[in-house]
Amino acid sequence: MFRPAVIAATAAVLWCGSVAAAQAAKVIRHKIPNSDFPIAAAVEVPAGKATVYVSGKVPAVVDTTAPKGSAAAYGDTKAQTISVLAQIKQQLESLGLGMGDVVKMQVFLVGDPAMDGKMDFNGFMEGYRQYFGTKEQPNLPARSAFQIAALGNPLYRVEIEVVAVRP
């Protein structure tokens, strides 16, 4: 017959082992088959990992020499994407995280009047590729991108929100 102390000790060892295994488990990023497009087809987050939900970020003024409240002050879709991702990077770093910890991204793009009201997806991708799928930061998030009618400021073309996982 087992003594209560032996049972308790065995349970504690098993519990500690399962916690260590959960903490050691890594985020798994599934690539899109036969594609070099820089997003993940899916991302698996193991049990026990904390997720961080970052509210949508919109562009800051990128050209302080442009007239206040002008489209030039906020830049094109590429410039706005870079501005937004820089803010997200800063927010994540303030939380002890980085862009490589992002597992999910939702992108809201407003149509560009210079493109007959269509979203500038190529401009977005030029900015996005500076932060994701690079040699320095190869981790890719699962991502959705939508064209929407408008954002809070009529000069905004980009809003991005992300979910990150603590390593």
Residue ranges of predicted features:
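N-terminal presequence-like segments and the immediate start of the first folded domain
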Residues: 4-9, 14-86, 90-106, 112-167
